[in-house]
Structure formats: structure tokens, C-alpha cells
Amino acid sequence: MGSQEVLGQAARLASSGLLLQVLFRLITFVLNAFILRFLSKEIVGIVNVRLTLLYSTTTFLAREAFRRACLSGGAQRDWSQTLNLLWLTVPLGIFWSSCLGWVWLQLLEVPDPDVVPYYGTGVLFFGLSAVVELLGEPFWVLAQAHMFVKLKVLAESMSVILRSVLTALLVLWLPHWGLYIFSLAQLLYTTVLVLCYAIYLIQLLRSPESAKQLTLPVSRVTQLLPSISRSRAFVNWKEAGLAWSFFKQSFLKQILTEGERYVMTFLNVLNFGDQGVYDIVNNLGSLVARLIFQPVEESFYLFFAKVLEREKDASLQKQDDVAVAAAVLESLLKLALLTGLTMTVFGFAYSQLALDIYGGAMLSSGSGPVLMRCYCLYVLLLAINGVTECFMFAAMSKEEVDRYNFTMLALSSSFLVLSYLLTSWCGSVGFIMANCFNMGIRITQSLSFIHHYFRESPHRPLAGLRLSPVLLGVFILSAGITSVSEAFLCCERGWPARLAHIAVGTICLGVTLGTAFLTETKLIHFLRTQLGRSRLSDKMT
């Protein structure tokens, strides 16, 4: 498969994921706004911070390294060995779920059962849901490696929407069930997710032989299960070694990704109510990251991993592939920069209004608006880091991954210390400040890698981080106008003033986007080309 074809599939995966995710995120956004009206801050804090941390830690430690290792490399591989390796995530998940569940029940502070009932049941069900999701890991990797565009988005959309619907119904009808509600909803989510992948692949294997040859490297359902053969090793030891390197890294990356939740959970720097408010603001602030950056990062990680070879310098690889990879990276960096700047500039002036509409006075009063404004700056760093690390992890050799683990260890340690100190000093805003600091360090590391990678080639993809002076001036002007508008029109002067404030922001946003369209012609050409390819591919499939 050529680099242009892989690029087209990656763009198709990203664009399809983006459009469908916008749809189902809007649905869940409305459902979650409804649910918040019926919950206490304490229950939100327990579910969204502590129990979700149990679930995410279990799944991350059990599968992240296997995902990265098994999605790397070319098409020439023994998929039976790869599937055997992926099935090891299930016993790993049982191990981590059991260990972490004991910690959550025996070592951490147990909430008041009158305020948050059925905490033990919640721990059990969230740990179980993590193991259930790991049962679908071989199917997920197989589908992702072969770029089944609509399957991933459809499965995630259906499972998230069903979880939100069940939560809303139970909160409305049986509010006294407490954590039973969220436990059942989480188990439904993982079950539906696994069934979507399993049913799709099983049906595909039962389709006519010609269709199977064009898609999957297996021909029978039983080949999806673990298998032992005397003629070959149980797993590919090169993949297993790479997975071990990524596992050491993933352990540290998890601390960086969920560091504030670990500090809140283990060091008790915030009460459960404050944890709930922080997490709501965190989820709302990261909405753009989940809608845009995550699909792009996942899809183009696949592109870079397939086009580039890990063990070779750029000068020793096919120069056509290197040129395409450099051009794509430059465009992705520009897209991330523009999206992040837009969020930062307009987020500052519209944070309080957004929180008031979404959650009422519980969010728009107190520390909520300050948290949201700080998070808007963090989104800019998050956008750039997502693209740079996406390329770096796809191009690193095993030895470079091992060396980078030491950097991650230092970052993880500094993040935990910095989070604790800043939170003790300035409250929950300290978490975002610590995240910004560490994200800046990670961006510096990945930019250094990219610069070194392309040093011997004529390509300079880091030019994507430079804006035209005209567009930069429009961003600054928009920031000033919307800040003045907020001071005079928002948010205590009623809905007519609020609507006027929204109108001012809409005009400024339109001018900003129009300027970007006229000045960033290279990015516009890239988007038109790849979106056009994805639409053509959709029509042909």
C-alpha cells in the first residue's frame, strides 16, 4: 500500500470520526447537562474522578503498550502471533483490576454512605467493566490496523449514547440507587463496545471468500482466538519487546495523563464536591480535544507508523514517503495551532457563559470560570503536543523509546510534586498550571526529536508552527474585543445582553476564520484534498 493511499485512509478515518463524534457528543452533551441537575457534586466527584480513575488505569496499563506495539510495522507479520499477544491483555486486566480494586476499597478514604451510597459496588462494577472491555482488544486492533473507518466511530457512538441514556433514565426514575446507576451504565457501555467489534468481525468472516481476502488476514472465527503451534513461537518476541518498552513508558504516561486525579484520590487535596466541579470543567474544556485532536492523533499515528520505518533515519527511507510524512506533519501542526489558539482566544471571554448554560450556578460561580479560562490555554498546548507526540511515537526506534522513558519518569515525578504544591497554594487551578508546565516540557522534547529526525532532509515540517502576522493580529484584536464585550454584556444582565455578547463573538470568529482561509492557503489545500478523498472513498464503499 503506497503512502498516498495510506494517507487517504487516515484522512478518511479522521474526518469520519470527527463528523460522527460531533453528532454523538452533542447528544451526550445535552444528556449530561440534564443529568447534572439531579446529582450532588459529591456523587459527580466519586464517579468522574475516583471510579473512572480505577477504570482508566486498569485499561491503560493492560492494553496501551500492546496497542502501540501491534499497530506499528508493516503488513508482513504473523497475525496469529499478534492476536496471541493481544489476548494477554485480559489476564493483565484481571490482575490490575484486582490489585487496584483492593487499594480503592481498603486504602483510600471511603465516602459517607448517606451521601454516596453503594461505593463498594461501584468499585466492583467499574473494575469488571475494564476487564470486559479488554475482551475486545484483539478485535479493536485488527479493525484499527485495517482502517475499518465507520466501525470504530459507530461502536463508540452507540455505546456512549446508550450509557448516557441509561444514566439519565435511572437518575430520573431511581435516584436513590446512587452508584448502582453509574455502575450499570458503565458495564453496559463496555459490553456494547465489545459486542459491536466482535459481531462485525464475525459477520465479515462469514461473508463470501472474495470479501474476506480484501480485508482480514484471518479466514475463520477460531483464528481470532489464542492458538498454540509447535512450528512457531506463541508470540512475536520483537513485538513483545516493543510492547514491554511501551509498557514502561505507558505507566509513566498514565501518571501524566491522569496525574491530577491521582493527586486528588491519594493525597486528598480537594473534597469530593470540589473534585466534582473540577472534573466537570475538565471534561467540558477538553471537549474540543476529544472531538478533534483525538481522532486526528489516532488516525495519523497509524499513517506515520505505516509509512515510516522505526529503525531507519529519514535519509535512508523512501524519500517520497518521507516527503509525504513531512507535508502531513506540517499541516497537522498548523491545524492544531489554529484550533488551539481559537479555543484560547475565545474561551477566555465565554467561559463563564458556557458554564452557566451547561451546569447553572453550581459551575458558573466560585472557581469554575477561572478553571475554564486556564483550561483554554491548556487546550492549545494539548493540541500541539498531540500532533508532535503522535509523530514521535510512530517514528521512534525501540532504543529511543527506552531512552524517552527516563524523561517520562522525571516528568511524572515533577508533575506529582508540582501538582501537590500548586494545589495547596492556589486550589484546583494548580492542577491546570502543573499540566501546562509538563505539557510544555513534553512539547519541547518532541519538537527536538522532529527537528533531529528531518535534519538531514530538505523538509522542515516545524514551519507549521508559524502564523502569518496578519492572522496573529486578528487573533489579538478578537481577544481584546470579546474581553470588552464580556465586561459590559455578560453575565448578570439577562439574556438580551448575553445574546449580544454571543453575536460579538460570532462576528469576531467569522473574521478570524476568514483571515485564516485567506492566509493559510497550504493548510486549506491539504484539508480540501484529504476531505475530498475521504468523501470519494465513502461513496465507493
UniProtKB/Swiss-Prot annotation:
It is a multi-pass membrane protein. GO terms for cellular component: endoplasmic reticulum membrane. The gene is Rft1. It comes from Mus musculus. It is found in: Endoplasmic reticulum membrane. Intramembrane glycolipid transporter that operates in the biosynthetic pathway of dolichol-linked oligosaccharides, the glycan precursors employed in protein asparagine (N)-glycosylation. The sequential addition of sugars to dolichol pyrophosphate produces dolichol-linked oligosaccharides containing fourteen sugars, including two GlcNAcs, nine mannoses and three glucoses. Once assembled, the oligosaccharide is transferred from the lipid to nascent proteins by oligosaccharyltransferases. Keywords: Endoplasmic reticulum, Membrane, Sugar transport, Transmembrane, Transmembrane helix, Transport. This is Man(5)GlcNAc(2)-PP-dolichol translocation protein RFT1. Belongs to the RFT1 family. The chain crosses the membrane at residues 16-36, 45-62, 85-105, 123-143, 154-176, 187-207, 335-355, 376-396, 414-434, 470-490, 499-519. PANTHER family: ENDOPLASMIC RETICULUM MULTISPAN TRANSMEMBRANE PROTEIN-RELATED, PROTEIN RFT1 HOMOLOG. One of its GO terms (biological process) is protein N-linked glycosylation. Its main location: endoplasmic reticulum. Pathway: Protein modification; protein glycosylation. Disulfide bonds: none annotated. InterPro entries: RFT1. Pfam families: Rft-1.
